[in-house]
Design a protein with these regions (language model features):
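Short glycine/proline-centered loop/turn elements that form peptide/ligand docking sites
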Residues: 41, 54-56
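Structural motif
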Residues: 45-46
Length: 118
């Protein structure tokens, strides 16, 4: 299962429908200001987006305290589902790679069908 499919499944399990692809999920969310040194505004359940300045290519689910769950491939990841951290103290190669590609974060505040979440 790829990263955006994992996010879609996680939200669907709670009755919340979000778009399929990472770049669509990024556009769908309410932006949350985030950087590697400033994680204070992130809440558990927020989506974290990674990629190049031009395009979102990866998405993860924030668990709290800068940790996130994601599904990543063999080239830049764990070849499956894992948990990594945005904190600089986490020197694992996977965490370092994705930290270098951090684009931002977003909060899901409605379903894809337009239903507002409370």
């Amino acid at each position: 299962m790829d990263c955006s499919g994992l996010m879609q499944l996680a939200f669907a399990s709670q009755g919340i429908w979000i778009p399929r692809d990472a770049y669509q999920q990024e556009r769908f969310c309410q932006p949350v200001a985030v950087s590697v040194g400033a994680l204070d505004l992130l809440r558990p359940g927020d989506l974290i987006f990674f990629g190049s300045p031009r395009r979102c290519t990866h998405v993860a689910l924030h668990l709290g305290s800068g940790r996130y769950r994601h599904s990543s491939g063999q080239q830049h990841g764990r070849n499956g589902i894992g948990v990594d951290s945005l904190h600089l103290a986490d020197r694992h190669p996977v965490a370092s790679h994705y930290r270098s590609e951090l684009r931002g974060a977003g909060r899901v505040i409605r379903c894809h069908d337009g239903t507002t979440l409370s």
